């Protein structure tokens, strides 16, 4: 959950998000080292006089060719690893289909019979005390903790985007096309997201709420919801 005046990431709740936070820190340290080197060279040029031997030296040309290549490799390797992990969907325990509409989400649990529902934002006038304005919904997405979840995402009208920052998930919902993503929640909790593609007048009013629970609670919830439907 984001906090007021927060500058960093939300607490990671999935392995992918943990990797993304680590890669951000890694890239930030590389950028800091580059900036420090450039500032040092600028200060050196202001203090000391440059000789023609220094400017024309082949060693300098060799260094500023090899050094950027090493920096790019240090950034590319972990980035490619994370991209591969984000695209890898191997034997999910649960498949969820999310369909974007103006301006709400529909969900289908494809592993269950008749387990579907629409998820609307709760208006401020009906919001219970202690709940978050513009983020709460009438039906949450409930998933079992520490289980691979595949999410198939599409839209029924215009472009949308299904995004939950603390899980490291953001996938476009495109009419007539099926996109997919996956995640594993590492702890129980309630994780908030929103549509991240401008989709009309009420774009700001279609939040996403994912609730991670132990498997026994998820089984009880799914049985109860299947009976009600």
Curated annotation (Swiss-Prot):
<feature type="binding site">
    <location>
        <position position="199"/>
    </location>
    <ligand>
        <name>Cu cation A1</name>
    </ligand>
</feature>
<dbReference type="InterPro" id="IPR008972">
    <property type="entry name" value="Cupredoxin"/>
</dbReference>
<dbReference type="InterPro" id="IPR014222">
    <property type="entry name" value="Cyt_c_oxidase_su2"/>
</dbReference>
<dbReference type="GO" id="GO:0005743">
    <property type="term" value="C:mitochondrial inner membrane"/>
</dbReference>
<feature type="binding site">
    <location>
        <position position="197"/>
    </location>
    <ligand>
        <name>Cu cation A2</name>
    </ligand>
</feature>
<keyword id="KW-0496">Mitochondrion</keyword>
<keyword id="KW-0679">Respiratory chain</keyword>
<dbReference type="GO" id="GO:0005507">
    <property type="term" value="F:copper ion binding"/>
</dbReference>
<feature type="topological domain" description="Mitochondrial intermembrane">
    <location>
        <begin position="87"/>
        <end position="229"/>
    </location>
</feature>
<dbReference type="GO" id="GO:0045277">
    <property type="term" value="C:respiratory chain complex IV"/>
</dbReference>
<keyword id="KW-1278">Translocase</keyword>
<keyword id="KW-0999">Mitochondrion inner membrane</keyword>
<keyword id="KW-1133">Transmembrane helix</keyword>
<feature type="transmembrane region" description="Helical; Name=II">
    <location>
        <begin position="59"/>
        <end position="86"/>
    </location>
</feature>
<keyword id="KW-0186">Copper</keyword>
<dbReference type="GO" id="GO:0042773">
    <property type="term" value="P:ATP synthesis coupled electron transport"/>
</dbReference>
<dbReference type="GO" id="GO:0004129">
    <property type="term" value="F:cytochrome-c oxidase activity"/>
</dbReference>
<feature type="transmembrane region" description="Helical; Name=I">
    <location>
        <begin position="15"/>
        <end position="45"/>
    </location>
</feature>
<comment type="function">
    <text>Component of the cytochrome c oxidase, the last enzyme in the mitochondrial electron transport chain which drives oxidative phosphorylation. The respiratory chain contains 3 multisubunit complexes succinate dehydrogenase (complex II, CII), ubiquinol-cytochrome c oxidoreductase (cytochrome b-c1 complex, complex III, CIII) and cytochrome c oxidase (complex IV, CIV), that cooperate to transfer electrons derived from NADH and succinate to molecular oxygen, creating an electrochemical gradient over the inner membrane that drives transmembrane transport and the ATP synthase.</text>
</comment>
<feature type="binding site">
    <location>
        <position position="203"/>
    </location>
    <ligand>
        <name>Cu cation A2</name>
    </ligand>
</feature>
<dbReference type="InterPro" id="IPR011759">
    <property type="entry name" value="Cyt_c_oxidase_su2_TM_dom"/>
</dbReference>
<keyword id="KW-0813">Transport</keyword>
<keyword id="KW-0472">Membrane</keyword>
<dbReference type="InterPro" id="IPR034210">
    <property type="entry name" value="CcO_II_C"/>
</dbReference>
<dbReference type="Pfam" id="PF02790">
    <property type="entry name" value="COX2_TM"/>
</dbReference>
<dbReference type="InterPro" id="IPR001505">
    <property type="entry name" value="Copper_CuA"/>
</dbReference>
<feature type="topological domain" description="Mitochondrial matrix">
    <location>
        <begin position="46"/>
        <end position="58"/>
    </location>
</feature>
<dbReference type="InterPro" id="IPR045187">
    <property type="entry name" value="CcO_II"/>
</dbReference>
<comment type="similarity">
    <text>Belongs to the cytochrome c oxidase subunit 2 family.</text>
</comment>
<keyword id="KW-0812">Transmembrane</keyword>
<feature type="binding site">
    <location>
        <position position="199"/>
    </location>
    <ligand>
        <name>Cu cation A2</name>
    </ligand>
</feature>
<comment type="subunit">
    <text>Component of the cytochrome c oxidase (complex IV, CIV), a multisubunit enzyme composed of 14 subunits. The complex is composed of a catalytic core of 3 subunits MT-CO1, MT-CO2 and MT-CO3, encoded in the mitochondrial DNA, and 11 supernumerary subunits COX4I, COX5A, COX5B, COX6A, COX6B, COX6C, COX7A, COX7B, COX7C, COX8 and NDUFA4, which are encoded in the nuclear genome.</text>
</comment>
<dbReference type="InterPro" id="IPR002429">
    <property type="entry name" value="CcO_II-like_C"/>
</dbReference>
<dbReference type="Pfam" id="PF00116">
    <property type="entry name" value="COX2"/>
</dbReference>
<feature type="binding site">
    <location>
        <position position="195"/>
    </location>
    <ligand>
        <name>Cu cation A2</name>
    </ligand>
</feature>
<keyword id="KW-0479">Metal-binding</keyword>
<feature type="binding site">
    <location>
        <position position="195"/>
    </location>
    <ligand>
        <name>Cu cation A1</name>
    </ligand>
</feature>
<feature type="topological domain" description="Mitochondrial intermembrane">
    <location>
        <begin position="1"/>
        <end position="14"/>
    </location>
</feature>
<feature type="binding site">
    <location>
        <position position="197"/>
    </location>
    <ligand>
        <name>Mg(2+)</name>
    </ligand>
</feature>
<keyword id="KW-0460">Magnesium</keyword>
<protein>
    <recommendedName>
        <fullName>Cytochrome c oxidase subunit 2</fullName>
        <ecNumber>7.1.1.9</ecNumber>
    </recommendedName>
</protein>
<keyword id="KW-0249">Electron transport</keyword>
């Amino acid at each position: 959950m984001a906090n007021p005046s927060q500058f960093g990431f939300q607490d990671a709740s999935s392995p992918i998000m943990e990797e993304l936070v680590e890669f951000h820190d890694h890239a930030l340290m590389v950028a800091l080292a580059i900036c420090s080197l450039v500032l040092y060279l600028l200060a050196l040029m202001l203090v000391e006089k440059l000789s023609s031997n220094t400017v024309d030296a082949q060693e300098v040309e060799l260094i500023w060719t090899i050094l950027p290549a090493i920096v790019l490799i240090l950034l590319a390797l972990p980035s490619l690893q994370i991209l591969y992990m984000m695209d890898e969907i191997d034997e999910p325990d649960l498949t969820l289909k999310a369909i974007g509409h103006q301006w709400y989400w529909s969900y289908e649990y494809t592993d269950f019979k008749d387990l579907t529902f629409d998820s609307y934002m709760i208006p401020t006038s009906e919001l219970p005390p202690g709940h978050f304005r513009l983020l709460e919904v009438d039906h949450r997405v409930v998933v079992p903790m520490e289980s691979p979840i595949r999410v198939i995402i599409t839209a029924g009208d215009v472009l949308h985007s299904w995004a939950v920052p603390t899980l490291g998930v953001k996938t476009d919902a495109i009419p007539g096309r099926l996109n997919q993503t996956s995640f594993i929640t590492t702890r129980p909790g309630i994780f908030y997201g929103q549509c991240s593609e401008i989709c009309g007048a009420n774009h700001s009013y279609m939040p996403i709420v994912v609730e991670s629970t132990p498997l026994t609670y998820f089984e009880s919830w799914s049985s109860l919801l299947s009976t009600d439907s």
